[in-house]
Regions:
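Surface-exposed, interaction-prone regions used to assemble/regulate multi-protein complexes
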Residues: 1-128
């Protein structure tokens, strides 16, 4: 996972000041959070770089909805902005898992799914 420079990039994308905590200072375990809060939604990312874990919480205010994802095996987090679209991408070590894409501006959008859907995951009558 990316280290400290990614905290600044996430904070800039989320337009906030990150919270950094050392859960176990003797082990050097860091946990950092960023939060994006707008009139319609609140999004929080909690990152444990050493454990390669990311928790994503998305709260919509109108109508009220909550989506929470606990992600493991995260290889890197990439923040980008192109033509006014702010995006956070969460990549995984497993190449069969699609990158999670979270668009913050102009509209909050969360896109994630499997790149390859294994036939073994479906009953025989659904397989082609």
């Amino acid at each position: 996972m990316q280290t400290l420079p990614s905290i600044a990039a996430l904070a800039e994308a989320f337009e906030c000041t990150p919270t950094i905590e050392a859960d176990h200072p003797e082990l050097g375990v860091l946990n950092y959070e960023v939060e994006f809060d707008s009139e319609d939604e609140r999004i929080r990312l909690s990152v444990l770089p050493v454990a390669e874990e990311v928790n994503v919480s998305l709260f919509t205010k109108r109508p009220p909805r909550i989506v929470r994802l606990s992600l493991e095996d995260v290889s890197k987090i990439v923040v980008s902005e192109k033509e006014g679209v702010k995006r956070v991408e969460i990549h995984f070590h497993n190449s069969e898992v699609q990158t999670l894409s979270l668009h913050l501006r102009p509209v909050v959008t969360l896109i994630w799914g499997n790149q390859q859907d294994s036939p073994e995951r479906h009953p025989p009558w659904e397989r082609d």
